[in-house]
């Protein structure tokens, strides 16, 4: 979900 830990894209 949005606002969880950093993902593969590097977004928050």
From Swiss-Prot:
Organism in which the protein naturally occurs: Physcomitrium patens (Spreading-leaved earth moss)
Coiled coil: none
Function: May be involved in the regulation of photosystem II.
Up-regulation conditions: By light.
GO cellular component: chloroplast thylakoid membrane; photosystem II
Keywords: Chloroplast, Membrane, Photosynthesis, Photosystem II, Plastid, Thylakoid
RNA-binding recorded as keyword: no
Sequence similarity: Belongs to the PsbP family.
Name of the featured protein: Oxygen-evolving enhancer protein 2
Compartmental location: Plastid, Chloroplast thylakoid membrane
Any one Gene Ontology BP term: photosynthesis
Superkingdom per UniProt: Eukaryota
């Amino acid at each position: 979900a949005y606002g969880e830990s950093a993902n593969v894209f590097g977004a928050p």
